[in-house]
Design a protein with these regions (language model features):
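Catalytic zinc-binding patch centered on the HExxH motif and its immediate surroundings
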Residues: 38-65
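Catalytic Zn2+-binding segment of zinc metalloproteases
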Residues: 89-105, 129-132
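Post-HExxH zinc-binding segment in Zn-dependent metallohydrolases
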Residues: 109-136
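Long, well-structured alpha-helical subdomains associated
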Residues: 129-190
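Surface-exposed patches in mature extracellular/periplasmic domains of secreted proteins
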Residues: 20-36, 102-103, 131-144
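A metal-dependent hydrolase signature that marks the N-terminal structural subdomain at the beginning
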Residues: 1-44, 177-190
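Active-site recognition of the HExxH zinc-binding catalytic motif
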Residues: 19, 83-96, 120-121, 125
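Short pre-active-site segment immediately N-terminal to the catalytic Zn-binding motif
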Residues: 68-85, 110-112
Length: 190
């Protein structure tokens, strides 16, 4: 478990350093995000008590939470760990760019939440492509595709088909704009 925590912390630090110039240019705060670990499947955060393997909380400038169950179940996959870290960091990008505020003005419901979650996953795969810390071989590419299709469709995080579509879109996109889930029809964010 200590090795997984090191991987998480290294991935968060590297990702944050990569985003600092963008945040500075846009006038966003650049402070480091606190990383928290919790036992079981429930995180207690300033945003409330949430049941999830990993959580981003936007309160107080943002913080990341990773559950012990996530670390034990996925301890053999570097790609899985990075996908989770980058997904949660994707929510930080959304919070920084005020997408959380804009979302609050939209009708509540699963589709609005799905657009947010699928966009974070799209960001995550773009960050994986840009991550030079491990080789993106054909084997790793297939592991990534399989990981995207392995999520259980809970109505909020997207169907395996949508996650694969947006995940590959983010992976192959030249810019973060390729992850704009807010301008497509409902059929693209199932």
């Amino acid at each position: 478990m200590a090795e997984m925590k090191q991987q998480i912390e290294a991935a968060v630090e590297c990702t944050h350093k990569a985003w600092i110039p963008v945040f500075k240019q846009l006038g966003y705060p650049t402070h480091s995000l606190p990383i928290n670990y919790y036992e079981g499947g429930t995180a207690t955060t300033p945003c409330g008590t949430l049941q999830a393997p990993a959580v981003y909380c936007s309160a107080n400038g943002g913080s990341l939470y990773f559950g012990s169950r996530l670390l034990r179940e996925n301890s053999t996959s570097v790609i899985w760990i990075k996908l989770m870290v980058f997904h949660e960091y994707g929510h930080h990008i959304q919070a920084q760019s005020k997408l959380f505020n804009a979302k609050a003005k939209l009708p509540s419901g699963n589709e609005t939440e799905r657009r947010m979650e699928i966009q974070a996953e799209c960001y995550a795969t773009g960050m994986i492509r840009s991550d030079d810390s491990f080789a993106l071989t054909e084997k790793n590419y297939q592991v990534l595709r399989k990981a995207l299709q392995s999520f259980i469709d809970d109505g909020i995080h997207g169907s395996p088909e949508s996650l694969l579509y947006w995940g590959m879109r983010g992976f192959h996109s030249e810019s973060i704009g390729g992850c704009n889930t807010w301008v497509v029809g409902s059929e693209k964010v199932r």
